[in-house]
Amino acid sequence: MTTPGKENFRLKSYKNKSLNPDEMRRRREEEGLQLRKQKREEQLFKRRNVATAEEETEEEVMSDGGFHEAQINNMEMAPGGVITSDMIEMIFSNSPEQQLSATQKFRKLLSKEPNPPIDEVISTPGVVARFVEFLKRKENCTLQFESAWVLTNIASGNSLQTRIVIQAGAVPIFIELLSSEFEDVQEQAVWALGNIAGDSTMCRDYVLDCNILPPLLQLFSKQNRLTMTRNAVWALSNLCRGKSPPPEFAKVSPCLNVLSWLLFVSDTDVLADACWALSYLSDGPNDKIQAVIDAGVCRRLVELLMHNDYKVVSPALRAVGNIVTGDDVQTQVILNCSALQSLLHLLSSPKESIKKEACWTISNITAGNRAQIQTVIDANIFPALISILQTAEFRTRKEAAWAITNATSGGSAEQIKYLVELGCIKPLCDLLTVMDSKIVQVALNGLENILRLGEQEAKRNGTGINPYCALIEEAYGLDKIEFLQSHENQEIYQKAFDLIEHYFGTEDEDSSIAPQVDLSQQQYIFQQCEAPMEGFQL
């Protein structure tokens, strides 16, 4: 989104009227967003708490009231499952010792199995409600902790399983437990709430409506063990996550101050989740972007682009990329933090998704004003972009094409000539054969901007010859543009027709240039016709 003033300025100053400013500054494209829409490996939205072997051994030695886990197998099973009738009897007994022992058995079942029997647990009448009841036992913090662990692992399951925990009334009690005097109980409550918030936007909003944020943020005000901080910032990121719809900004924006100092924690997991939270908060209208900027996080986010762990770099880059979708002033804040050198470094990343996001970020900078385009030129970024345009994976080439076309749309004559001298014409022509209609349009728009400049030069120097027509012909661009006159997309064939008519005259179409289709590469193949070796006969 752009401010009205900026939009009017762009519509007047950009040579290319077919790409409007909102198109040029792209928050997210609707198609082809594998990276942005897939579940990231770097960040789990739900986590199951699994005891270590050491913890299990310690518990078995210290627990004198219950059976060892191995003995569960020898006990009488309830019909059809792993839950024993003794476990059910014990959990509903009035003995605190038996309640604790049975709860631990349930917890072990839900922690150690590759496929924990969550459905069996939640279908056992009254069991989930009983665990929620145990959460209220302030006089027995161990029972609170074990019950919270059981419910955490139930909530780590699917949406239906998570909903059972919510319907049992666990969320308000978990939020109360964030203020428990026992750190184990606090941490397990954070974990459970993170799982519930991570299930869906509906669950996230319910947890926010239960007023989780004040006690959750209060946790960060004291010295915590590292696992507590990790769980708390992960839960915080889940509360900020989601786009359909996003969380109510007023309910999550109070966490910005905490996130700003979490960016200086050395732990990689904490840094990654803090950056993810900021990337979610900055993904939206300019007022949200401004709130993130006002939190003072931009310089640190740019510094984290050079972190040695991709788990941190990916969300930091996403947050920086979101901020530069704002207006020119907001984009300038990132540029003033020396972001371009870091982005140039990321363009040579061996990780394709990082290269792609860096190109996307740069494309939103080149959608800015001419001074901002010049900073990209001065940072020597365009040679790398043109190389990517020729050699990278297609999804990355698409983002590089946007970056170059945006620069031809808003750039000065000198800036466009610089891009031509770097060799941008041939890779733009190569994109005219791809199956992706949007990128064909982007390439056509870039070439049109270049041709328009050439026409102005021809008039100015009096030659009447557009110097860029020949360069496009040499790159077999004219053949491809002619073929696009029969494209199924109306905007593409109209644009191709207009370019041929306006810049290349009305030559007869040569049927020999009709291309074959290479479906494996998602593009058309043109034969490159060459003059005979002996030359033309006079």
Curated annotation (Swiss-Prot):
UniProt protein name: Importin subunit alpha-5
Q: Where is the composition biased (Basic and acidic residues)?
A: 20-36
- What are the boundaries of the region NLS binding site (major)? 149-241
What are the annotated GO cellular component locations?
cytoplasm; dendrite; nucleoplasm; nucleus; synapse
The PTM N-acetylmethionine maps to M1
Pfam families to which the protein is assigned, alphabetical: Arm, Arm_3, IBB
InterPro entries from the entry?
A: ARM-like, ARM-type_fold, Arm_3, Armadillo, Importin-a_IBB, Importin-a_IBB_sf, Importin_alpha
Report a single Gene Ontology molecular function: nuclear localization sequence binding
NLS binding site (minor): where is this region?
318-406
Subunit info here reads: Heterodimer; with KPNB1. Interacts with ANP32E. Interacts with ZIC3. Interacts with NSMF; the interaction occurs in a calcium-independent manner after synaptic NMDA receptor stimulation and is required for nuclear import of NSMF but is competed by CABP1. Interacts with APEX1. Interacts with RAG1. Interacts with CTNNBL1 (via its N-terminal). Interacts with AICDA (via its NLS). Interacts with SNAI1 (via zinc fingers). Interacts with DCAF8. Interacts with ITSN1 isoform 2. Interacts with TALDO1 isoform 1.
Q: Where are the ARM repeats?
A: 77-117, 118-161, 162-206, 207-245, 246-290, 291-330, 331-372, 373-412, 413-457, 460-504
**Any idea what job this protein has?**
Functions in nuclear protein import as an adapter protein for nuclear receptor KPNB1. Binds specifically and directly to substrates containing either a simple or bipartite NLS motif. Docking of the importin/substrate complex to the nuclear pore complex (NPC) is mediated by KPNB1 through binding to nucleoporin FxFG repeats and the complex is subsequently translocated through the pore by an energy requiring, Ran-dependent mechanism.
* Encoding gene, per UniProt annotation: KPNA1
Q: Where is the IBB domain?
A: 1-57
Organism of origin: Bos taurus
